[in-house]
Design a protein with these regions (language model features):
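Bacterial N-terminal signal peptides that target proteins for export
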Residues: 1-6
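Bacterial N-terminal signal peptides
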Residues: 7-15
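Periplasmic-binding protein-like
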Residues: 28, 84, 88-97
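Signal peptide-proximal N-terminal region
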Residues: 44-67
Length: 113
């Protein structure tokens, strides 16, 4: 299910709001520290490998991936999601592993649509 949501989010980023953009920006927020950090690090390595394999492109567009460590904390996830959407101006936020973190940020994404 998480993989499906990630694929949908990336697909949406490539079609909505980026039609005239030169680069699609993806905020990849995942758990990179603590005991569960190994999962997020493996995901980060997979994303980096895929980007290398695809020549830094998503759907034929240049892509920039901004990684962020949510520390598996809902309050940190909210702050990071806000920063990624407002300051970094990402087209999509992906990579969230834990449902409690997704629940913490899902309303923010509706505000920024």
């Amino acid at each position: 299910m998480k993989r499906f949501i990630t694929v949908c989010a990336i697909s949406a980023a490539m079609t909505a709001g980026t039609a005239f953009a030169e680069t699609v920006k993806v905020g990849y927020m995942t758990t990179l520290s603590g005991g569960a950090g190994i999962i997020g690090k493996q995901m980060q390595n997979a994303v980096n490998l895929a980007m290398e394999h695809k020549g830094g492109k998503l759907g034929g567009m240049d892509a920039e991936i901004i990684f962020a460590d949510d520390q598996r904390k809902p309050d940190v996830a909210k702050q990071l999601a806000n920063r990624l959407m407002k300051s970094d101006r990402v087209d999509v936020v992906a990579g969230v592993i834990w449902s409690n973190l997704l629940m913490a940020i899902h309303k923010l994404s509706l505000i920024h649509i």
